[in-house]
Amino acid sequence: MGNSQTKESRPSLSSSNRRGHQWGSSSSHGRSPYGDRHHAEGSRSRGSRPDLSMFGIGGSSDRDVATLEHRRETKQEREARRLEKERVARLKERERSMREEHVDGGYLVTQGVYVGTEDFNKAVTRQLMIERRLAPFWRGLNDFSDSWTEHQLMAAARGLPIPPPDEIPPELEYKNPPRSTEEAKESTIQHLMVPITSRSQSYGSEASQSSTPTHSLPSPTSPFASGTSSSPLFRTRAKTLASLTSSRHGSQVDAGPKEIQLPKDPFVNGQPIEAYLYKDATECPICFLYYPPYLNRTRCCDQPICSECFVQIKRPDPHPPEHGETDSNAANSTSDRDRQESQDGQLVSGPAACPFCVQPEFGVTYAPPPFRRGLVYATDSSLRPTFASPVSSSSSLSSANPPAITGRRRATSLSANDPTVITTDRIRPDWAQKLANARAHAARRSAAATALHTAAYLMNTNSSGNESRNFSLGRRGVMRRTGTSENQSVSNRSGSPALQALAFLTDRRAVGPETDFAEEGGGNMAPPRNSSRRNRIDDLEEMMMMEAIRLSLASEEERRRKEEKEAKKEAKRREKESKKAEKAARKLGVYSNNASSSALDVLSDPRHGKGSSSSSSMTGEDTACGKGKEVERMPPSTTNATASPSSLEIPSDAANSSPVAHVIEPGSSAQAATTQSLARELPKPSHLRHVSSASSSFSSLVDSTPDDPTGAYDGSATATEPMFNFRSLAAVIGDEDKGVESTEHVEDTSSRATVASSASGVAPSATETSGAPATGVEPVSVETITENGDCLMPKELETRSVEITHTAPNTEATS
């Protein structure tokens, strides 16, 4: 095959040579007639140099790659061609076997129920089927009915369409078998030979060979009948010895049993063999096809199983032991030590289990039908009477063989070592070899890995030992010159790790001068034997050191990058939280603005005067100090005049304890007017926010003008920014409203409100004044509310004269 491949590849190489150098050869054709030859020889020599071809420098490297690809494709094509040829041959053999061979109406080849690879031993399976120890491959029926007639059963068994019950197709018509005559019986008896059990196997093989139907059977006129010396039974000793030593191939053929094809008889007890077999069909519980009742039976639970399903069951592939799994063949070891050695780190392949009861060592038994058809072995003495008629054969077999199948199941299970049991290992005898090959392969891989680890360990050990020796006594030549023993070198080799590391660094830094000193001082000594190995180890260590430094730098860079990323994430998170807080503050500002309009409704509706007064006074007594702020109505000039350069900024604890408040810009008088107009136009009942104000937090910050910066609040300084609490509006008509006066006048009570605020801890409220009604607006000076306890919120009270008349239908408020 190699020569043919070389011959096939030569034309392509020469043609590519000509194509590749056509321009050069044509250009130099007129110069020298030998130019082409020298050029071809030079290219051939360059391409054939092994030192250049390994680097891919040769001129024919491209051609070599193309040749390898072509060769690889040819190998694949040859493999595909071989597989296709085997498949075609297998199909032909299957068709021939189904056409010419059968065993009691069954076949010796599979019927295509499973399309996977057939990895069972076909020769062993064939032998077991011919010996009637394993059921043949019956043809399975997809459907079956007990009411089918004989020709319907025949059509189903032959794979033909099932005809109607009252119609018999021409191909299914048959005639009853003719009765056997006396002449036929006499001729049959002449072909039979009574088996003699006292003969040896060699004589039995000769007798079986003479009775094989493939050879000419002896006739009454044959030499065997006449008894002459030319008969095979009367040949000389020389002929016998010559026949024994003549052919090795012939001896191998004679060693096996001979198959005999019984006379073709398509009837059993007057019925067609298909009708006799399939009239009591049984379903296989695995493939769900209907077969004759003569199926295999499991040895453990006596369940039926067809042969096609049986040959698919096998041992698992070799694998490491799992969950205490033991090796089955280890039980046959001679001693416990051998069994333990076989279990240590070895692959196992447990026996196949029964698909029904999951008992290991799966095996089947088979009870053949009470007749014989097809192939038999000539050496089987019990099959000699089968040459007779079907009726006589069935009667004789009933006495020679076990009784036929009965409806009663077997009561006990059979052992896996029973002679009648066929296990899955029997039809796959190479399972032990496969397991041994897998174990050897695993052992080779383990040995290779162990060798690699050992080599690496020895290299590291030798390198450390060399470094320690270099640190203590210098080079190996110096050690030999000074007469240092091997024991001392071994003791130096096994130093402490710190000493070895120091020796390693010292030797790396002073390797040049030390080498020069050793060469100068020991010029008459032999060169060190492991210098090249030491250099390789040094190079390897340098590479490892550089790799370690690179990995360290990379890890540091990665850590720094992660820290930067975390810092960016934290900054984004804080920015997002600040935006959320600002947004929430704006929402609370709008909410408190609505609350101010609802609180001002109290003054515009006289019907809610007393009730609001009483409820607000009661609420004001229970609340903490500093929660009430009145609406700012001071002119912008006054506010700006009293404001200090550092405006008020409310601390966080004060913001958490302060009620809902709203701060209006000092210069926005239009906004205050709008708020008052809304309070007059919407006379709705107000809830005074005595509940919601206690649960709400700081309302909103001041939308201050650019010239009013915010600053930290100083407790000792006077308040400069007006703060408002709309609960104090309800306190305008406070507890003093319970009197009998018809008209109350509130004005100029800043000092009293200051005293009340500091004493009771509630918001400053306006007290009642003497009876004269207010005629105008009298602004009062701004007073700072003194803090009481933990009330840090500064408050300003600007009182306005408010006249409330019970008798008047409307409340008159002068602003």
Swiss-Prot record:
Family assignment from sequence similarity: Belongs to the SIP5 family.
Keywords, in A-Z order: Cytoplasm
Disulfide partners: none
Gene label: sip5
Function: May negatively regulate the snf1 kinase.
Annotated GO CC locations: cytoplasm
Biased composition regions of type Polar residues, renumbered to the chain: 1-30, 224-233, 461-471, 482-497
Residue stretches of biased makeup (Basic and acidic residues): 34-44, 61-82, 172-188, 317-326, 556-585, 736-750
Origin: domain of life: Eukaryota
Cell compartments where the protein resides: Cytoplasm
Protein's UniProt name: Protein sip5
Main location group: cytoplasm
Biased amino acid composition, Low complexity: 200-223, 388-404, 635-647, 668-677, 691-704, 751-767
